[in-house]
Each structure stands twice: as C-alpha cells, then as structure tokens.
C-alpha cells in the first residue's frame, strides 16, 4: 500500500498559493504534499549578451534548497563556493521547461528569471518547482500586460511536471521520498497542457524496465499532469 493509501495514479494533495511574496512580479508557494517550494519571477529589461539586438526575450531559472529542507542539515552551496551538479541539472531543466511555454519573440528584449527555493523536501522538488514556477511566470507576464509593457500575451499554454516510477513492482505516480528512495525505476515527465512532452528523464535504479512499463509510466504521467493543470487553472482563477 502507498503512503496515505493513495491510488497508483493519484498525485499528492496539490496546493498553489499565488502572490506569496511582496516584491516579485510573480510569486507562488507550491505544495506537493509535504514538498514545499517558493517560486518567484523577476522581470529585467535586458537579455543575455548572445541575444542582444535579436528582438527576442529569455526565460531562465535558478534552484536551491534551504539547509534544513531535508532530514539533516545541508551546507549552503554559497558556503561551498560553487553549485553542485544536481543543482545545475535541475535549474537547467526548469528553465528549458518554462521556455517551451513562452513565445520569446513576443516577450521582446527582456528576461524573466524564475527562482525556485525548496523550503521542505519530500520528493519531487524539481517537478513541484516547474509546476509552481509556471504560475509565477504567468503572473509576471500578466503584470507586464496590465502595465502596458506587453500588448501581446506570449504564453503558449500551461506546463506541469510530475514524477512516476516503479516501486515494489508497481507503477505509481508522484513519488514521495519514502517511495523514491526504494524505486526500481524513477522518471520525471514535463508536459504542455495540450499533451505534448517537453522532457522525459527516466532511469532504472534497480531492475531495467520494459517497453510496456515505459508506456504505462508515460500514461500515468499524463494522468497526473492533467490533475496538475486543473490545480494551476484553479489557482490562476482566484
């Protein structure tokens, strides 16, 4: 039986709280069960050097975990003097995922940075970050539309992400830490709301998985993301 007696296709309770901080153009607290991430969107009227003069914008992301977001304290990466490989991999994934939902030409020569700070980790921090940052990004775009900086909405659609895996021989959706730590297969799937996939990251931690299991996992991810899109729409309507 899964933790909290969840069905195999049932994500953890999802909560998205908008306007969570005071200063950012978009800010969200996203909760996937006990995993909690603050996502803020910052708009700047400049782009990276490689994009200057091209009339296109940019969306990027940074990711980090508070020292006591986990069971035991982690040293801050700033204290170490460099980011770890896992951190860089995750923030690149978040940035790629969010760029897929934006028409960069319609954004114009400005950049939006999404900062995703994990305040409590219980599995799925990268998927929660993407799902919450999507809403923060839309709020930042709406800020630009409302003040007249933008006249055309560059948002192509919602983006959400969820983990799926095989635990004790059973395919399951939205793994929390106790499941993730013993999973035979772990996979993260990022999707647009029209069903197209942005990224699939899958690894056999124990037993290799079959083609049939892969298709089952992708179907579970689609079902899970559809529930996340509902949560995003509800939050954006508030």
Swiss-Prot record:
GO molecular function, one term: tRNA nucleotidyltransferase activity
Catalytic activity annotation: tRNA(n+1) + phosphate = tRNA(n) + a ribonucleoside 5'-diphosphate
PROSITE patterns in alphabetical order: RIBONUCLEASE_PH
UniProt binding sites for phosphate: 86, 124-126
One Pfam family hit: RNase_PH_C
CDD domains noted in UniProt: RNase_PH_bact
Gene Ontology BP annotations: rRNA catabolic process; rRNA processing; tRNA processing
Keyword Cell inner membrane: no
Family to which the UniProt record says this protein belongs: Belongs to the RNase PH family.
NCBIfam families: RNasePH (TIGR01966)
Quaternary structure note: Homohexameric ring arranged as a trimer of dimers.
Primary role: Phosphorolytic 3'-5' exoribonuclease that plays an important role in tRNA 3'-end maturation. Removes nucleotide residues following the 3'-CCA terminus of tRNAs; can also add nucleotides to the ends of RNA molecules by using nucleoside diphosphates as substrates, but this may not be physiologically important. Probably plays a role in initiation of 16S rRNA degradation (leading to ribosome degradation) during starvation.
Protein name: Ribonuclease PH
Species: Histophilus somni (strain 129Pt)
